């Protein structure tokens, strides 16, 4: 049993290591170089390390090699969920200056318009984008000098705004739930400057941008009783801190709920969490989709005489979204030249028909060429490709019957049997009626004699 226990322990350790996510996230430090140009320098976020000092990175400037301390654990939890075989996330660093919120509805967060001295110093904003999660993390580098030579810079994650649904694909007419969570841990100087225990007031802002236009969807400042703009499109947000621990760290929820989404609600959603003089923002992409329904007529059989063309085939592709990306192919299955081939004939598509729910429909037409006896039993198929469908698409088919070559089907045999049975019953019934009439006439004739 000891070797088995050892193998289980090794497997458990390997599983933990695989699911722990990257220990280092490679980034780019992006700064304004003047004249409308941007300058980029390599940087890195060191999230975990083994015993001893961090591994050296001679390719990085010490102030851009950041050993991150995450008191709330939100950043670490997100990275642990990152698959080991996924491409590395995209990360950018930029300078951040603490400022009061500019929106009128958020002015209650900062009664004083000047920034407290406790927030002086350097700040960095880390933006990490991936299909798994999207986050922004406000980092405060350590201000105390380090022993020379400095190989890295310690930084604390003060405010982290995170979503696990950076790309949301919602079925047309269904509710959308856009995940948002955030965490805050004030630095020592901030905590010393604040006399009030418990989480600070915060503001939550959701905006939608689509086709170059943007507007405020929802704003909230829980507990401040400020005059808020009316929420749009029936949007509701779960805006609250998760706990009220006196000294933090604190986590909160800002998830947005949209009922019965429609195509006009597609676009980029910007979620911003406002703290007094600090902000964090993430972007989410919402797309609406609906797979098409497919029907083919006439069905299930189409008839034609040898040397004649079958009747026109109509493939109705109904109530799908988006309109772009739809392709229709006509196939002949089981024909004389193989199991699958392109159906010959004249084909065309109708114009789009728009429905009140935002979905669209169209019809595809095929006028097949004349058939021969070899086409008997072949099947015409309408195959539809659309972004909402699997790679092979979806299809509907009808069977071709060439006149004079098909024997009676099971339905025909059953019909003939029933017809013969009814005819036999009718003959017997008529015979019984005739016999009854002749029997009733005999006594009358005897009395007359």
UniProtKB/Swiss-Prot annotation:
Give the matching InterPro entries: Ig-like_dom, Ig-like_dom_sf, Ig-like_fold, Ig/MHC_CS, Ig_C1-set, Immune_Resp_Modulators, Tapasin
Topological domains, Cytoplasmic: 435-449
For membrane topology, the record states: Single-pass type I membrane protein
Domain of life here? Eukaryota
**Ig-like C1-type domain location:** 292-399
Q: Recorded GO terms, molecular function? A: MHC class I protein complex binding; TAP complex binding
Cell compartments where the protein resides: Endoplasmic reticulum membrane
Q: List the disulfide bonds.
A: 27-91, 315-382
**Which residues bear the site annotation May be involved in interaction with TAP?**
428
Q: Which Gene3D superfamilies match?
A: Immunoglobulins
**Which residues, renumbered to this chain, are glycosylated?**
253
> Any idea which UniProt keywords this protein has?
Disulfide bond, Endoplasmic reticulum, Glycoprotein, Immunoglobulin domain, Membrane, Signal, Transmembrane, Transmembrane helix
Which of the residues are on side Lumenal?
Answer: 21-413
Q: Predominant location of this chain?
A: endoplasmic reticulum
Q: Name one GO cellular component term.
A: MHC class I peptide loading complex
Q: Where is the signal peptide?
A: 1-20
Sorted alphabetically, the Gene Ontology BP terms of this entry are: antigen processing and presentation of endogenous peptide antigen via MHC class I; peptide antigen assembly with MHC class I protein complex
Q: What's the domain remark here?
A: The N-terminus is required for efficient association with MHC class I molecule and for a stable interaction between MHC I and calreticulin. Binding to TAP is mediated by the C-terminal region.
State what this protein does: Involved in the association of MHC class I with transporter associated with antigen processing (TAP) and in the assembly of MHC class I with peptide (peptide loading).
Assembly and interaction partners: Heterodimer with PDIA3; disulfide-linked. Obligatory mediator for the interaction between newly assembled MHC class I molecules, calreticulin, PDIA3 and TAP. Up to 4 MHC class I/tapasin complexes bind to 1 TAP. Interacts with HLA-G-B2M complex; this interaction is required for loading of high affinity peptides. On its own or as part of MHC class I peptide loading complex, interacts with ligand-free MR1 or MR1-B2M complex, providing for stable MR1 pools ready for metabolite antigen processing.
Q: What is this protein called?
A: Tapasin
In its UniProt entry, the species of origin is given as Canis lupus familiaris (Dog)
